[in-house]
Structure formats: structure tokens, C-alpha cells
A protein has these predicted regions:
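Short glycine- and Lys/Arg-enriched binding-loop motifs that mark or flank ligand-binding interfaces
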Residues: 9-15, 59-60, 112-113
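Gly/Ser/Thr-rich beta-alpha loop segments that engage phosphate groups in nucleotides
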Residues: 7, 15, 65-66, 118-119
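Metal- or metallocofactor-binding catalytic centers and their adjacent structured scaffolds
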Residues: 1-34, 89
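Metal-dependent enolase-superfamily TIM-barrel catalytic cores that perform enediolate-based chemistry
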Residues: 67-191
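Short beta-strand segments
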Residues: 21, 40, 59-62, 79, ...
């Protein structure tokens, strides 16, 4: 990480850093003949019983650099809640298909962005949240109980000269306005 030398790791980039980190971890695991997950637990001294499986986040609407649709948020995600992974995957699939039908019904394009989520031309970022909430309900699930929302804001992508260009490339927002917007969303949506 120190090789990059920048505060936000922009010189090497997250993809390169992640790839090298994973390669080093795999090499370490292979050298001691352990599965990767056991090696990582050993290196970080994680007790066998003291761990949680990662939460499954599914990217279902793309914006930012992943889609040419005017949305500044890079990834709108759903996080299905269930004990079994296969059920979380099934729930996500149902919601994804419900969103496809909803977008089509409302006249939005159903093409996908670089990350596999839909890339509709929406009026604003919040409209993406509203459509996902609607799709969750259409699929028969309860937002905030069965399914939660996640966002990859990727704010560094629209930050220039001390301001955020969140809603438009011409209107600058101070950090305080961004924070207030996200606070309102957290109250309004199960993020």
C-alpha cells in the first residue's frame, strides 16, 4: 500500500492492489499447504468460531463510470437477508427479474452496465432507490426486513476542486450537503 503513495490509492488503483494482495495471500497459503480461508484466519489470528460470512451484495443498477446513463452513483445494490446462501441468491434473482419487468413497463431501457446491473436513464440517483424498493416488493419481499440496500457512491469519481458534482456536472455541492442527503436516504430507505 505504501508503494502507491497517494491518500486514496489512485496511483496504482484498487484493482491492481487487490489483485496483488490476493496473489500474495494465495502464494502464502500454498506455501504452508492450507486453504486460503484457513491461512487468512491464521495470519490475522481469527478464532475458528469468531467469524462471520461475508454479506452477499448484488449490484442491480449501474451508474457512474460503469454506465453512460447520467447517474453519479456507481453501484446500487441489494443485500438479501437469509440464513442460507442459496436462498439469498434466489431472492436476488427474483428481485433482479422484478426490476427488469418494472423498468420495461415504465419505458426504461433494460440494457446492462459494465458491472452487470441495469443501466437505465433515470431522472436522478434517488429514483434508482425508489425503483429497487418497488422491485423488492413486487418480488414478494419486505424492504428493511428481508432485503436491505447498499450503495457504492464512488464519490472520488465526481469530486473536483473541493466540491462534489453529485446531481449534475455543473452544480457543485459541499461535503455537508452530500452528508445531509445520505442521512435523509438512510432514514427513508433500508440502507
Amino acid at each position: 500500500l505504501s508503494l502507491d503513495g497517494t491518500k486514496n490509492k489512485s496511483k496504482l488503483g484498487a484493482n491492481a492492489i487487490l489483485a496483488v494482495s490476493l496473489a500474495v495471500a494465495r502464494a502464502g497459503a500454498m506455501s504452508v499447504k492450507l486453504p486460503l480461508y484457513k491461512y487468512i484466519r491464521q495470519v490475522y489470528r481469527i478464532d475458528e468460531k469468531n467469524y462471520r460470512m461475508p454479506v452477499l451484495g448484488m449490484n442491480i443498477i449501474n451508474g457512474g463510470r460503469h454506465a453512460d446513463n447520467g447517474l453519479s452513483i456507481q453501484e446500487f445494490m441489494i443485500l438479501p437477508k437469509h440464513k442460507l446462501l442459496r436462498e439469498r441468491v434466489r431472492m436476488g434473482s427474483q428481485i433482479f427479474h422484478a426490476l427488469a419487468g418494472l423498468l420495461s413497463q415504465k419505458g426504461y431501457a433494460t440494457g446492462v452496465g459494465d458491472e452487470g446491473g441495469f443501466a437505465p436513464e433515470l431522472l436522478n440517483n434517488e429514483r434508482g432507490l425508489q425503483l429497487i424498493m418497488e422491485a423488492i416488493k413486487l418480488a414478494g419481499w419486505e424492504p428493511g426486513k428481508d432485503v436491505f440496500l447498499g450503495l457504492d457512491i464512488a464519490a472520488s469519481e465526481f469530486y473536483r476542486h473541493g466540491s462534489y458534482y453529485f446531481m449534475s456536472k455543473k452544480q457543485a455541492w459541499p461535503a455537508s450537503r452530500m452528508i445531509e442527503t445520505f442521512k435523509q436516504w438512510v432514514k427513508k430507505y433500508p440502507i
